Amino acid sequence: MITLLHIDTSARRTDNDVKEYNSISKSLAAHFMDKWITLNSKDKVIYRDLGLNPPDFISQDWIAAVFTPDEKQSEEQKSLLTLSDTLIDEVDQADIIVISSPMYNYGMPAVLKAWFDQVVRINKTFTFDLARGDFPIEPIMSGKKLILISSSGEFGFEIGGIREKMNYLAPHVETASKYLGVEEFYEIKSEYQEFADARHEESLSNAYRGVEELVKQLV
């Protein structure tokens, strides 16, 4: 049995009366999870919808608590870190992390950035040692896979694409996830949403097909 951590980040739901208002990234991620559980019914799923339940932004007091040794933390500091501890525990349990995310202003939604800020934490998910020279940070966890399921209004954000340099979503997620022990990164994406034309329909169909192919590849 393996554990999957499924994280949705869109501000949109998937049950709107108007179909066009539904979140594409959430719908694709739900399709991934449905296909996975159909083939692996005994696997454990941990679910978080950050769009509906956004994590707290970190603060100066939070940072101070993080850099205070556990045995010296006040009760107030321990309380400040309760959410972070919970989220890190979920990451620690996960073999596979599935993150669905729209591209907002060419990057990740604020709720996803807030989640990363809560979980990428010194002495919990990474260590820092200047004896390592110019690369002092190393992850504590290892062996995890991450699937980013994304949607965007425009297109061409892939390597070599016409908007490659405008893509601050996938590269950011991939880079930050390394400090959560992620060693394999996959992305499935739907593009052209704002154009609402045949290209979007084809991209969305390809994304659904890509979901099914990736599930078969990973099981």
UniProtKB/Swiss-Prot annotation:
Its EC number is 1.6.5.-, 1.7.1.17. It comes from the Bacteria. It catalyses: 2 a quinone + NADH + H(+) = 2 a 1,4-benzosemiquinone + NAD(+); N,N-dimethyl-1,4-phenylenediamine + anthranilate + 2 NAD(+) = 2-(4-dimethylaminophenyl)diazenylbenzoate + 2 NADH + 2 H(+). Binds 1 FMN per subunit. One of its GO terms (molecular function) is electron transfer activity. InterPro entries: Flavodoxin_fold, Flavoprotein-like_sf, FMN-dep_NADH:Q_OxRdtase_AzoR1, NADH:quinone_OxRdtase_FMN_depd. Keywords: Flavoprotein, FMN, NAD, Oxidoreductase. Transmembrane segments: none annotated. Gene3D superfamilies: 3.40.50.360. Its cofactor is FMN. The keyword Flavoprotein applies. FMN binds at S10, S23, I24, S25. The keyword NAD applies. Quinone reductase that provides resistance to thiol-specific stress caused by electrophilic quinones. Homodimer. Belongs to the azoreductase type 1 family. This is FMN-dependent NADH:quinone oxidoreductase 2. The gene is azoR2.
